[in-house]
Amino acid sequence: MRMNGRLPEANYADCANGYRIHYLDEGQGDAVVFLHGSGPGASGYSNFKTNYPSLVEAGYRCIIPDHIGYGFSDKPTDVDHPLSFFVECIKQTLDVAGVKKCTLVGNSLGGAIALGLALEYPALVEKLILMAPGGLSDLPEYQQMPGMQKVFKVFGSGEPVTPEVMKDLFATGLMHDPRYATDELVEERMQIMQIMNGHVMATMQVPVLVDRLHELECPVLGFWGMDEKMMPENGIMAMARNIKHLRLILVTECGHWVMVEHEAMFNRACVDFLLYG
């Protein structure tokens, strides 16, 4: 592993579909795979740098990929990005990494990808940890959320996205506590945004998965911040009413990133769930 600017660069999976997916691979033991969300400059490390070390310390092998179109992974412009494409890229990355069974930890888009993997490859997924996952509401509902409206406004204006604009977007669109929109976070995201293109977000398609949630047989731990500005809160009841084996934690004073704003609680809860279900 080496540092590339502010971000670590480590392993690349040459997937069967011809794309290269970048991923970190730390620790030994049962595999836990962290799936990051969407947004400008997103990467696995930036989303989960304060979480996966605690699980490595607890005795788990942690794999942190960058989704296709994000981080240091390939960024194709000649293919659309439906949920199934993200799912297959992660499945093929895990094949390369030799992972036969794992727990998936997914936030936002990463939560939708985790659900897609668990539904399409149930033998692969032992447990799910979901933080405000996508795939629980339809597009018009997302478009009404204030955080989403802020994203559309910033990136639809045609104006350059400066570090100051990025910081304000995170502080007011994603976080409950703006102190977590740190200069370090902004620098990490700005670095990746310089090498991203708009194709991934322009062609992303995430279907509503609510009607399939009853198919999940694995234990699920869910988190939802009560100051969530990105995901419609009907997702809370969608999970509660349709997932059979669910433990759901509602967190006050928390926005879209429970793993950032409440990292100690989140890390403890994840280790407890991994140990005891």
Q: Language model features by range: what are they?
A:
Residues A16-F72:
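Conserved HGGG/HGGXW glycine-rich cap/lid loop of the alpha/beta-hydrolase fold
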Residues L115, L119, E126-E159:
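Flexible "cap/lid" loop of the alpha/beta hydrolase fold
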Residues E215-C254, R268:
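Conserved loop-alpha-helix segment in the C-terminal half of the alpha/beta-hydrolase fold
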Residues G106, G110, A114:
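Gly/Ala-rich beta-loop-alpha elbow adjacent to hydrolase catalytic centers
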Residues V260-D272:
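Post-His helix in hydrolase/transferase enzymes
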Residues M1-R20:
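N-terminal cap/lid segment of alpha/beta-hydrolase-fold proteins
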Residues A16, L24, E57, I64-V105, ...:
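Active-site loop/oxyanion-hole signature of alpha/beta-hydrolase fold enzymes
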Residues E159-C218:
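Conserved alpha/beta-hydrolase catalytic His-Asp/Glu region
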